[in-house]
Amino acid sequence: TAGLVAALILKTRFPSKKIQIIRSEKIGIIGVGEGSTEHWNEFMNYIGLTFQDIIKNCDATFKSGIMFKNWHDKDYLHSIGPEHEIINGQYRTYYGKVISHDWSNKELNPLGTWENTVDEWHLDNDSPYNQFHFNTQKLNDYLHIIAEQKGINILDDEIKDVVLSDQGDISYIVGEKTNYASDFFIDCTGFKRLLINKLGAKWNSYSKYLKMKSAIVFPTEQKQEIDLWTTARAMDYGWMFTIPVWDRCGNGYIFDSDYITADQAQQEVEELLGKKINVGKHLKFDPGALDRVWINNCCAIGLSASFVEPLEATSIGTSINQTFLLMHRLPNYTKKSIDEYNKQIEIVLHNIRDFVALHYVTNKGHNEFWKDIKNVPLPGDLSDWLAHWKNNLPILEDFIHTGSYALFKDPHFIQILAGLELFNRDGLLSEYNMLSDANRKLADGIREERNVLGMNKVMIGHKDFLQRLRAKE
């Protein structure tokens, strides 16, 4: 996916440049299903796709966010959707009221989400959500077609070696069928990192902070109604994701192999589901990122550049933002271009690392694994921020240092902190009560507006909505 995303963005930005993809049909893709972040909409708009295209061609479903089950005393939904744009920058006032007054978690999420319903108005208008679940294979097949339509040459070959010039650049790559020379190379070879490793890139592990290192993936049948969210369920030794696409669900148990084996992980899942599962793959990984994702005339994107456990479905979003930044830095690039790019991407990846680590600041402690998780150190200055946020809602200014390409900022952190009940409600109430009467009334007005909209909208089930979309010409 990363290679196709990168090629499509770069071809759109540089239409006169020859771009080709080398991929091998013998090498499969990782994933039984895939989810996006809200950055997918920027990608679609940039290359000229519509949400109807994605729904029809990729067995896609809408994604409002991620439902966290069994991580805390109450389930909660991390949902950042277009509805927040309606609030015109005042969501913090509303969030402050919701959290400090202990309103339901549903009040933080778009209308109808918890009921798996969608406003019928969207059938002929804008997408109700800016995130999606995809059938990974169909997504790749569809992007392949779009890439060829845009003039990207896709060649079936397997990379065997990389040859460097005397100056240390990549001169050409050696394929099974022929050699390929180019001015610039994008390494999307996944965990193998065939190109960037040749240039001396080193792996910086996040395993000190993120303990998951194995996964089993497997499909299950689709439910009668299709969830509007990815489910992330805390398990005895990690967590399990469920990604609902049109005709089935893709699942994976992400676990710490220091505590259980893959067979034991499978047994735990089967006991939970009450049935046997067919495990497609057993994956092992070391969470982390390259020390430099851009070296000389090569940039690593996707799994070649980084891998943080898929708790917040960051893989596609990271590839998109990496490529958008690259397209600005690439023309007439200098050593300064490369250095600044690497600094910015390191910040992006640390933002993901810290956000994922936050999810494990939970009160779970029913077994040795979850007790040990409590003693895992927090990365960077996250512990200092948690102490600050205990009595203060996160604000955009807390994330200025992350730049415009970071995936997670104040609204995302607010929802996880609220879901894990890491706020001191009295502190937030004190902050809220310092607001003017007009601003406090605004928070009540937002709630009233939601209630009025809820009464007047025609809401239909997610599956029914998708069926109607798929049937439209």
Q: Each PLM stretch: what is its role?
A:
Residues M235-D286, S306-G317, R329-N332:
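Conserved FAD/dinucleotide-binding core of flavoprotein oxidoreductases
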Residues V32-D119:
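Dinucleotide-binding Rossmann-like beta1-alpha1 core, especially the glycine-rich loop
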Residues L8-K18, Q137, D141, H462-E473:
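Extreme N-terminal leader/targeting segments of oxidoreductases
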Residues F62, H328-E473:
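Long, low-complexity C-terminal extensions of enzymes
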Residues I9, S127-E268, T323:
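Predominantly flavin-linked oxidoreductase catalytic cores and closely associated redox partners
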Residues I9-G33:
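Glycine-rich FAD pyrophosphate-binding loop
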Residues G288-R353:
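Conserved mid-domain beta->alpha element of the FAD-binding
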Residues G3-L4:
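N-terminal Rossmann-fold NAD(P) dinucleotide-binding loop
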